[in-house]
Amino acid sequence: MSKIRGLPPAIRDPGPGVELGVENGLLCQLIHSPEFNLFSDSVVFESTFIQVTKQGNWMDAYERSATIILGVTSSVPSLPLPNILLMANVTWPQGPFSTCSTLGAPVITLSRILPLKYVELQIYDRTQRILRVRTVTEKIYYLRLHEKHPQAVFRFWIRLVKILQKGLSITTKDPRIHFTHCLVPKMPNSSTETTPESSRPASSQSSETIMLLAAERAGSSVLDLSNRHRFSEDRYTDTKTDNSSNCKTASPVASLIGMPMRATLIHSLWEQEDSCETLLQAPVASSLGDNFLGP
């Protein structure tokens, strides 16, 4: 077995991410396997943790160490930041003749797949290398980085937490760059939550106004094409009364078209990201290069 027990030696190819045990690990193999086939074009950044609890001093949460693999990935490889959190439980088979040196292959069970916008990651204890993970259901995990991981791996997690909170220079956290949608979860506070809509920046209002106008025009054009097609089919078979009834039933269609268009404008983070968009020229999150790992 390799030094990092969760990483089989068969996939230890040359490369800093693989050698550190943060790329092409067991969690990546699991979700890319035919059983799941999830995010097959995206790289998974992962590490092995031990779940701990605090009772005066940090100690293992269970009598036997609860090993958890925590990872992040992107639902679309072209996204500049990860948007999916993955958690898997690791169990080691125990037999009557098994010892620490003869343990068999670990059993990986995928336990959580969560959008990162519904998860709060926090560096809770730097000296003990402990992360605090809180989910949308208020479930809180305290995870200590496995001792086999070098300190550099924990620095990667520190950088990831900072990126998720503040964003990269290519995201809307940089006021010099304007996008029509948000790539980073907004950090709500009392001042912004109570601010009326009219007090938002003019650039944000104008951008949203343009999108609303475009959505309404698109909806009206679709409605117009639908009416033309309907009139052409019924021109020789229906009476004037039938045609007038068709016009009357078209009004609900306008509201049905308009509502989803407006509803999509309230989405943030990654829902509106276009994987084919070439204007951003954003670095791929799966590259795990200078944009993520840092110097």
Curated annotation (Swiss-Prot):
InterPro entries: GARIL-like_Rab2B-bd. Keywords: Golgi apparatus, Phosphoprotein. One of its GO terms (biological process) is acrosome assembly. One of its GO terms (cellular component) is Golgi apparatus. It is found in: Golgi apparatus. The modification Phosphoserine is found at S220, S221, S251, S255. It comes from the Eukaryota. Residues 190-206 have a biased composition (Low complexity). Residues 187-206 are annotated as: Disordered. Interacts (via N-terminus) with RAB2B (in GTP-bound form). Belongs to the GARIN family. RAB2B effector protein required for accurate acrosome formation and normal male fertility. This is Golgi-associated RAB2 interactor protein 1A. The lineage of its organism: Eukaryota, Metazoa, Chordata, Craniata, Vertebrata. The gene is Garin1a.
